[in-house]
Amino acid sequence: MKLGSDELMTRRAELPRVALKRPVSRMTMSAKMTLSALALAVCFAAGCGAARPSKYYQLTVPGDMAPAANPNPVPITLLIGRMTGSALYREDQIVYSSGGESMGTYEYHRWAEPPTEMIAEIMLRQLRASGHYRGVYSLRSDIHGDFLLHGRLYDFKEVSGSAEVARVTLELELRNVKTGNTVWTHFYSHDEPASAKDVSAIVAALDKNVQQGIAECRASLDEYFAAHPPAPPATQPAAAQPAPQP
């Protein structure tokens, strides 16, 4: 049976459309399965679920306490300036190294404040509480001081090796505000052994090391002023008494 030319052309035109329907359907299903697998892989790689919490640590900062009673304090006003350091120590990361040139930071263990700021605050509180000086204030205050104490933090980190240690290296400098001359310096460097190989033990060792270093610097500063006692402030001349009336 022969088909008319119009009918034959119509059937030929319909055949490709029918043949293409099934591959398109199979490709769509395959793409969906691939996308689902990729989404699961990304989810696992990103650590889907609750994020790991960060832990924060701080050094032991003395509380606001009344200065110790001292009938004869050194007659100066001491200003506590900035403690400078590398960018690592002006941020809140806890730094570690293996004793070589490379250093790293812990991702989920951080300081509550940058180490440079905590150490400056400890110096301020301890020197003020000692009662050894007429006054101890922060450089940020409006108080006029006689001497400025400031310094630089070189090391404040965990050092891994045969034993875990907490290394603190700093240098303090005392400057006469009036003359601008540096009159005293003190360098401190010490490796304090940690009781265990974990971050909490390293923090405890760093804290102990800092307290020991500041105590050593305080003793050296006291020795300087004992050997170079500043002149007491000049007393104001007494007001002239009025002449008696005749």
Predicted regions: what they are:
Residues 36-45:
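Bacterial N-terminal signal peptides
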Residues 4, 9-36:
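Bacterial N-terminal signal peptides that target proteins for export
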Residues 83, 152-156, 189-190:
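Generic short beta-strand segments
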Residues 165-175, 185-189, 212-224:
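C-terminal or internal capping secondary-structure element at the end of a domain, subdomain, or sheet
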Residues 116, 120-124, 130, 207-214, ...:
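Extracytoplasmic/secreted envelope proteins and their assembly/folding machinery
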Residues 48-116, 224-246:
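A structural "domain/chain start" motif
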